[in-house]
Amino acid sequence: ILDDGYYLPMDKYLFVYHDQLEYIGQLNPNIIDQAYAALNEEQIEEYNELTTQNGKVNYLLAYDAKVFRKGGVSQHTVYTITPEIASDVNEFVFDIEITLPQEKSGVIATSAHWLHKQGHKASFESRSFLFKAIFNITKLLHIKRSKTILFTSDSRPNLSGNFKYVYDELLRQKVDFDYDIKTVFKANITDRRKWRDKFRLPYLLGKADYIFVDDFHPLIYTVRFRPSQEIIQVWHAVGAFKTVGFSRTGKKGGPFIDSLNHRSYTKAYVSSETDIPFYAEAFGIREENVVPTGVPRTDVLFDEAYATQIKQEMEDELPIIKGKKVILFAPTFRGNGHGTAHYPFFKIDFERLARYCEKHNAVVLFKMHPFVKNRLNISREHRQYFIDVSDHREVNDILFVTDLLISDYSSLIYEYAVFKKPMIFYAFDLEDYITTRDFYEPYESFVPGKIVQSFDALMDALDTEDYEVEKVVPFLDKHFKYQDGRSSERLVKDLFRR
């Protein structure tokens, strides 16, 4: 609990009452009513301009913040406690902040810091110059077609996802007889590129006739390709759910309107016509360049032979699921990206969920987003009901043995809709999520299942089997133009005119 000698480290704190069960402290509504009654006209105007209920509550709670200053007057050593509703968990917390005087750096330390910054800047500029030089020289040397196809990603370690299905289809249609297929991958956008790939990537980008990407890929937006080159985006997610790219302009983390990000794509392949305007907006490209052939990695979902095979494999790998009702809990992460990604597991009453599993002969598989840093800790007494499959195989394989999906804002709902089985949406922070991230269509009328905003409501839906499953088939028909397992085939034929 110590943090550099301070009893309470800076963070947000819940108040929890421990008895036979844990109860999280709640905010008394009377406090809010009293705070609102004390506002003057100017404050009421500011209050009314706020767009979310939590934002309005936090505006009122801010007046109850307590500030403690060293010696009672210090401007530099300050300890602040602010009550608020935390947006990422939708719970009442106390936000603790400590402000300390900045240590003055000596001349030597200041000079060393300046030199380090200049060195880092020079290194970046030299690497950028070398990258563009290799690319431009290679591009000039390959004015004519080079008969080369490149698969590249800055967030994928190998040929998987949509890439794998497109690659296999290229081989099936014998495109590899006419083209040399190359790959350059990096597991994570923050990882350093292999030394050899620092030269291979700009060389192959300048040479390749067809370049496949499946996510944000910063380096390809810094160069100008030949008019004859095709830059093909096979986006890793199915459908248009949460806003991305230029759809987020003006929001936190969104690009400026004059950004070059994504605009390089000459083709983007999507699942249905309904996705076209959303992806065109997100990537800043023309609608005619967005083609609804279907998403390659969904082909396997329509393969009956594979379904039989993978069900047996999954039961062998996870014997706990044999003869059980399988519930997959697969939410998206909270936080502002890879560095701060987490999931608030305290929003799950594991004891109550275990009792449900015992009563209904069920097991829960937890599949957390790859970004989530805090690991799920399953207690010994709950291991007969719960299992963490976050590190297990492709999530699509798990869908084949899943009887019920519990999610929130994950695009996994598109793939699971193929199975025409029930879903529950545990969206405890919906209002704030809409404000910060937003969706292409109204969430409440869009998702194919029951929406619950508390764990009590989630358990009620499970107990009564209130899933609103009638929403699934219309959702599937709207977002999957093709339901035949031939999306990869259509994509390759469209691109190579075969």
Report each predicted region and the residues it spans:
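N-terminal pre-catalytic "stem/leader" segment of glycosyltransferase-like enzymes
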Residues: 8, 18, 25-30, 37, ...
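C-terminal amphipathic helix plus adjacent low-complexity
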Residues: 135, 306, 362, 455-498
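A donor-sugar binding/catalytic signature common to diverse glycosyltransferases
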Residues: 211-240, 393-437
